[in-house]
């Protein structure tokens, strides 16, 4: 069973750290991830169009392909970039203070740095496609192990809290059943959600490198601020948290966000509005 346990342990441990990525970043690099608020700029967040102009001016070798607006207004925006004419289309990011208009970090590849490496470990065990296959099989086998446990111990509630200590074998059997019963719902959620993400990644269209990333990638005369304002009219209560700009063939401008009073199962990126990259239709 070690071929299931080891990948599962790595995924659970790395995922537990990644959950607190923002909090750890705030502790390790507060001057980079936090905005510089003062009385003068307290309520003067610069516009998205200004952000685009600043990035184009100071990082003219890159194309901005995404703006991540943190739900916490005290956090910097995370700007995603692709270098012009980069054949690999590698995504990089910077932290941008939307109140002072300052770039807080150098472009960093998405899989660099501690959390980048940890994310790669969590997603593929550093094994690329083979890692995705291993983790998919791990999720499937763990799911069936959890279900088989419920089948074997159908009346588990009768001995749920029984823990006999008179003999080692009996004690280990009882502790195994107790831990298994309490951990099974969590393991099932991990397996199902993990398998769902792997399925979503597998069905994504193939990324074609022949798409040229340059300044003419979309209609730059379109106002991002007008699109954001329009999105709030198109979908009542909509609050955008990620602006996705074209980065591959056929891609348009998409706004990811949430709707106020939405179901608690949704996150801040659950609702998506798409606009044409040329005419914003």
Give the ranges of each region predicted by the language model.
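Conserved histidines in hydrophobic membrane contexts and catalytic metal-binding motifs
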Residues: 1-281
């Amino acid at each position: 069973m070690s071929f299931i346990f080891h990948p599962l342990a790595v995924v659970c441990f790395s995922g537990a750290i990644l959950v607190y990525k923002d909090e750890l970043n705030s502790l390790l690099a507060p001057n980079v991830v936090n905005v510089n608020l003062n009385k003068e700029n307290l309520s003067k967040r610069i516009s998205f169009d200004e952000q685009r102009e600043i990035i184009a001016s100071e990082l003219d070798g890159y194309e901005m392909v995404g703006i991540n607006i943190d739900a916490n207004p005290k956090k910097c925006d995370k700007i995603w970039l692709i270098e012009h004419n980069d054949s690999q289309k590698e995504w990089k990011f910077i932290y941008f203070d939307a109140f002072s208009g300052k770039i807080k970090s150098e472009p960093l590849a998405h899989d660099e740095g501690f959390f980048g490496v940890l994310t790669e470990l969590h997603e593929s065990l550093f094994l690329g496609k083979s890692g995705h296959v291993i983790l998919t099989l791990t999720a499937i086998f763990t799911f069936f192990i959890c279900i088989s446990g419920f089948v074997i111990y159908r009346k588990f509630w009768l001995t749920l809290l029984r823990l006999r200590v008179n003999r080692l074998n009996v004690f280990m059997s009882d502790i195994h059943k107790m831990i298994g019963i309490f951990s099974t719902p969590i393991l099932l959620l991990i397996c199902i959600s993990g398998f769902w993400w792997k399925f979503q990644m597998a069905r994504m269209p193939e990324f074609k490198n022949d798409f040229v990333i340059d300044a003419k990638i979309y209609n730059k005369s379109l106002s991002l601020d007008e699109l954001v304002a329009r999105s709030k009219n198109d979908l009542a209560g909509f609050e955008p948290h990620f602006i996705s700009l074209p980065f591959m063939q056929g891609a348009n401008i998409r706004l990811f966000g949430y709707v106020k009073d939405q179901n608690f199962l949704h996150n801040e990126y659950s609702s998506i509005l798409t606009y044409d990259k040329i005419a914003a239709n």
